[in-house]
């Protein structure tokens, strides 16, 4: 049914007034600019609804500080690394430019590259050292052959993909690697090789805007309530 802009706005207002704040939810798409996202956030604050989300899948993220959700070493910093560990990621398909930089570094410096999980052909050699959270547990507890290699590196670089963060153990994976690197001074004022490889262009900006605030639990109420059809009004912003 065709309508004018005013008619559409009036219909939206009527719908909003007909439901309770906890029955309204919003989802922000991956290509939305930050100005619109901020306005959307303020709009939901006016509605007194906390049901605002941008993730397409329910994966763990800790928004408490920026280093928890960015690529800390930078792409250029890959060339400074003396060891690379991929955790639940295939950079060839998830970030081709980044993968090209890894390949360049491998070809020029012959640095060792390891992976937890089998990402397939990455165009350079790597060694699979595990495929489960149990292997990560052994690494951070210094019970794995790889542990000493990681501790011996001066600038180790770890790339954690969303596939790892989507696991029930996603929070453990990130937090334990962060704790391990910090405790052993592998995160310091000169180097931070703990990197999160996000899939959507807007993710970092939306986290900077505190869209998730302190909701770092993987099983967020948004996805649970959406699955159980508890929302009566779902507002999509470029989603």
Segment roles from a protein language model:
Residues 1-239:
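Catalytic alpha/large subunits of respiratory electron-transfer oxidoreductases
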